[in-house]
Amino acid sequence: MIKAIKGFNDILPAQSAKWLYLESILADVLGRYGYEHIRLPIVEQTDLFARAIGGATDIVEKEMYSFTDKSDPPTPLTLRPEGTAGAVRAVNEHNLLRGDTPKLWYIGPMFRYERPQKGRYRQFHQLGVESFGSALPDADAELIAMTHLMWQELGLKDEMRLQLNSLGERDERHAYREALVTYLTDKQEQLDEDSKRRLTTNPLRILDSKEASTQALLIDAPKLANFLGEESVAHFEQVQTYLTELGIDFEINPHLVRGLDYYNKTVFEWVTDKLGSQATVCAGGRYDGLVGQLKSIDTRDAKADAKADAKADSKPVKSEPAVGFAMGLERLLLLIDAVAPIADIPACDVFVVAHPEVYSAGIGYAQNLRYSRPDLRVKMASATSLKAQMKKADKSGAALTVIIAQQEIDDKTISIKDMQTGEQKTAAQDWLSDKDNFCRRK
């Protein structure tokens, strides 16, 4: 028997109903803020991710699912490991920034070759939200406020903690990177193996090392906050002021750097204590250089150039402001199951059972009910015996079963059985057409 690939999971109907419920709440909040839905390809050119994410990141070096197509010459392609790069590519390709400040959201699968564990899979799903065109700190605060409202709507507000940091501008990070490398080079032998490698490829990622020994070394390391310019400091302080005015609590985490190279200024994470090591549920920040950077992609070796850029922090391209976040849906559902479980959502409200001799009348009744009550989920079984159909009705989770036999046809009535109490009554054929008589369960 062929089975699903390791790290790629089926989402079966009972669980899928909870996914749809979650996605509807998230979409509702996004609609309240005026964000528009965009659908993006799951496959992009490999160069896009190498340039956007950074050639020295774990994602590009070790985690991407890449292949070449059958064109001549072959084109290197990659299953998307994240959504921001594709969203920026779409904004550039379709000139969405021309005279506008698009606010977009998307939802769907992402792919990374990682060791599968609870809350971390090789195919996983993200909600991505991107706001383009504003360099002002209110755009940062708006996204954070939006996520705060999402937690409130999902009953998770008390389970989430907001962490903030500022990465400053490119030249400020470059100066800090040099100071950090100088400090750590003398202590290189005390670093864990990953941090030793990152010292020459992506030293800022050492700040979020999970190794206690490395964190101990960082206590006396130079602080990024001391390298920020006046404008970066003012921007970050204004974000904090907005959040305070909105009543959103936060904590400053000076080691928060994020795992993608495109971020600048504000970065943030929503974390929880309920999911063990997979504590981050939502994360994002500002990426003012990425739109302009991807506009300037040429035919050079993108991965090699991205590594060179990460090392030398080359001359910045024109700033095209943007800010966004991504939310892991698997982790979010794990958190919901732990603290505010979504009740089982039945796939059926009304089950129609019809005697085989009048089965066509049952089909007609069910179809008319679907027209008159589009809010109801109406099911029927095949034209087997009444007993067999009733067994299926019992298993369906329906609140009511409508029974139609010759007697009901003659009397122009229906028999209605309450599946919870077992009580049965006779009613007019149009009884269920009146919402006052029966409302569907949420």
Swiss-Prot record:
Subcellular compartments: Cytoplasm
CDD domains in the cross-refs: HisRS-like_core
One Gene Ontology molecular-function label: histidine-tRNA ligase activity
Record's keyword terms, sorted: Aminoacyl-tRNA synthetase, ATP-binding, Cytoplasm, Ligase, Nucleotide-binding, Protein biosynthesis
Major location (coarse): cytoplasm
GO cellular component, one term: cytoplasm
GO biological process: histidyl-tRNA aminoacylation
Keyword match Nucleotide-binding: yes
Enzyme Commission code(s) on record: 6.1.1.21
Catalysed transformations (reactions): tRNA(His) + L-histidine + ATP = L-histidyl-tRNA(His) + AMP + diphosphate + H(+)
Xref: InterPro entries: aa-tRNA-synth_II (IPR006195), aa-tRNA-synth_II/BPL/LPL (IPR045864), Anticodon-bd (IPR004154), Anticodon-bd_dom_sf (IPR036621), His-tRNA-ligase (IPR015807), HisRS-like_core (IPR041715), HisRS/HisZ (IPR004516)
Quaternary data: Homodimer.
Recorded family membership: Belongs to the class-II aminoacyl-tRNA synthetase family.
Protein name as it appears in the record: Histidine--tRNA ligase
Organism listed in the record: Psychrobacter arcticus (strain DSM 17307 / VKM B-2377 / 273-4)
